[in-house]
Design a protein with these regions (language model features):
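Membrane-proximal helix-turn-helix segments that form the acceptor-binding/catalytic region
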Residues: 2-31
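Helix-loop-beta element that forms the nucleotide-linked donor phosphate-binding surface
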Residues: 23-31, 39-59
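Conserved catalytic-core segment of nucleotide-activated headgroup transferases in glycan assembly
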Residues: 44, 54-140, 191
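Acidic donor-binding loop of glycosyltransferase active sites
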Residues: 139-154, 165-167
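Short hydrophobic beta-strand element within catalytic cores of glycosyltransferases
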Residues: 158-161, 168-174
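Short acidic/histidine- and often glycine-rich active-site loop of Leloir-type glycosyltransferases
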Residues: 173-188
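Conserved acidic donor-binding segment of nucleotide-sugar-dependent glycosyltransferases
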Residues: 187-195, 203-209
């Protein structure tokens, strides 16, 4: 994807990398990882097995009633536009969304969060609303949430709430880091690579929307 990020993100990434190295090399520290892949990598590079464990994110899954589907008319991004997130949203708006709208012309893309107004472009059916001031999530019914993360680097806590609320979403592999892959069901929780992101969303839109109970 030929990504470039600004100096702020580079600075934070460098600081986090140095801290991670300090923790890994500390023989008195007990390491807790958020995914089995991270744990396996640590054990591979260090040869240590007794000073580490994994605590994966396991939200409580709601009961889903697969009743008569309703059509989905909106894609939703819920989150601020920080420097590294902007790269992901730019990629989605410029590369992914046109493919989706070419297949399903009536679909709209709505963004809520800090600095999302910069994307407001009604002529392209893109609506940047700014901060969401209400409780819960915007436009839950008749909407599909998207998490087009192309950088990764941490657990996306909003996914935790989407999972527990039974709100359908499509995420990149990077955006699902730290979560148990057993939760992926290809209906309410879809995870795919960047190459097939548009196709996964189109397929999910054609499935319709299912109510949760």
């Amino acid at each position: 994807l030929a990504l470039k990020v600004d100096w702020k993100f580079d600075y934070l990434l460098d600081a986090a990398t140095k801290l991670e190295k300090e923790i890994i090399n500390d023989s008195l520290a007990y390491k807790i990882f958020i995914s089995q892949e991270d744990l396996n990598f640590y054990q591979l590079i260090t040869g240590r097995f007794s000073d580490c464990t994994v605590w994966p994110f396991r939200p409580k899954l709601p009961n889903i009633s697969l009743e008569q589907p309703k059509s989905i008319s909106k894609l939703i991004w819920f989150g601020g536009i920080d420097t590294h997130k902007k790269k992901s949203i730019d990629w989605f708006v410029n590369k992914v969304l046109p493919k989706i709208q070419q297949s399903i012309s009536e679909i709209e893309f709505h963004l809520w969060g800090r600095r999302t107004e910069m994307y407001n472009n009604p002529s392209r059916k893109i609506f940047g609303h700014g901060f969401w001031v209400m409780e819960g999530f915007p436009c839950v019914e008749g909407a599909l949430y998207v998490n087009p993360d192309i950088i990764g680097g941490g657990v996306k806590l909003k996914l935790f709430s989407l999972i527990e609320e039974g709100i359908p979403f499509v995420s990149t592999v990077f955006g699902f880091e730290g979560y148990d892959k057993k939760m992926i069901d290809n209906s309410m929780r879809i995870v795919t690579d960047t190459e097939h992101f548009a196709e996964a969303i189109i397929s999910r839109l054609q499935m319709g929307y299912y109510n949760n109970v």
